Regions:
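A cross-family phosphate/adenosyl-ligand binding-site feature
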Residues: 1-119, 125-200
Length: 200
């Protein structure tokens, strides 16, 4: 059984965290430990038709945002890694500087120091120099920065299609297969020698 910690912050894009939880719930070998930040509850209410309690029901273990005595606040509690989706710029900055003012940042700090996979899904646009500097620093520390950027080669027909692809890329970081994934497999019927570079 693999334990994966999921943090959901108050940044817009609550559906990313919700869909990630739904997909993880379908994995019989994964135990999900969830933390919703204070503002995540508000964002979930504003952006989805779910309540915070509905979202918590998708996890195996749920912690309060300020529960610093939680199991996931210690490196001796073994987990396979952590995802923060969506990840606010405040949370990102806190993780970069080691300022763990809540359980999400503390669990991320532990994940980094234990050299376990930490996947951050930053939600902000445009990005300032501060945001970019924080992401670069965290990437150098070993965190995986997975911005929720859509792919268009799979011809998404809905927001759901876009979210599905982004969540697939998040799950890829843990080698968790997605049956619904629409992956790039090259140009159908084309040979490499026939492809030409076109300058616009």
């Amino acid at each position: 059984m693999r334990r994966i910690v999921v943090g959901v912050t108050g940044a817009t894009g609550a559906v990313l965290g919700v869909e990630l939880l739904r997909r993880l719930k379908q994995c019989p070998d994964v135990e999900v430990h969830l933390v919703l930040s204070r503002w995540a509850r508000t964002t979930i209410h504003l952006e989805t038709e779910l309540s915070a309690r509905d979202v918590e029901g998708l996890a195996d273990v749920v912690y309060s945002w300020d529960e610093q005595t939680a199991a996931i606040s210690s490196g001796s509690f073994r987990v396979a890694g952590m995802v923060i989706a969506p990840c606010s710029m405040k949370t990102l900055a806190g993780i970069r500087t080691g300022y763990a003012d809540g359980l999400i940042a503390r669990a991320a700090d532990v994940t980094l120091k234990e050299r376990r996979p930490l996947v951050l899904v930053p939600r902000e646009t445009p990005l300032s120099e501060i945001h970019l500097d924080n992401m670069l620093a965290l990437s150098r520390m070993g965190a995986r920065i997975v911005p929720p950027m859509p792919a268009f080669y799979n011809h998404p027909a809905s927001v759901g299609d876009v979210v599905d692809h982004i969540v697939t890329r998040i799950l890829d970081q843990f080698d968790i297969e997605s049956p619904s994934a629409k992956r790039w497999n090259g140009v159908p019927g084309a040979k490499d020698s026939s492809l030409k570079v076109v300058n616009y």
